Amino acid sequence: IQGVWDKRTITPLERPARFENRAFLSPEEILEYEAASAEREDGRPLDFSRTSISVHDPDDLDYGSRYVTTGQTSLVVEPSSGRIPAYTEAADKRAEEARKMREGRGPADSWIDRNLSERCLTWGVPQGMLPQPYNNNLKILQTPDHVMFYLEMAHDVRIIPLDGRPHLPENLRLWHGDSRGHWEGDTLVVRTKNFSPKSNFRRANVALETEERFRRNAEDQLEYILKIKDDTTWVSEWSVSYPMERSDGPIYEFACHEGNYGLLNILSVARTLEKQERENK
């Protein structure tokens, strides 16, 4: 499975309501979907009448232009609805408690108030393994006893042992979780647990566990299956599946800290507003 792989696709993560219970599109519908997507992205101007303009220029975004070759109506394949399961009461309670903790404290008191991706630290696991608005390349390197995933987005690196060693003790928690891999025939299986409470994947708790499967089902295609389990967050397990396409191009540097004016400006504006408020008293 070694090589550089392209995760881009315009296929939605969850099945749109208009497709209801349909798991796949016809070839004709795929062509129509791709044409409509291209029309939306072609020279779209920013709407400066809005109170907040887009973070990125449309030319900087690169979702790709192709639907997945499988024709599935969503990347979510389980449950059969193609939709992410509902949150548990515990997950809703955690979200409400987090909201209350932020009351009276602005989201820009400090750089630590901003999320990990805004701070150029990590896009996270398994979020980084899913298609993104840009930087969708994944480089895989293999040795007899390790596999390395180098993600273009946020220059995330995952080094995964294949030698059968046990997982770390549960009190050791990592942003990317603790991954262990093994081969089942021609399929690489990676299981990850021990996520840090600082990780943030769709409200998931430290109980989050994932299983990833990588199988080269064609010379230029890598099948990826992601199973997600956290019974403190979702009412049932759910799975994502999609094919990555081989890329011949290199992965260029992801320079984020060097040009992270967004974080600087957020904090600077917050301090300016606080100063104005003090002066107006």
Place the predicted regions along the sequence by residue.
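PEST-like low-complexity, intrinsically disordered acidic/proline/serine-rich tracts
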Residues: 1-281
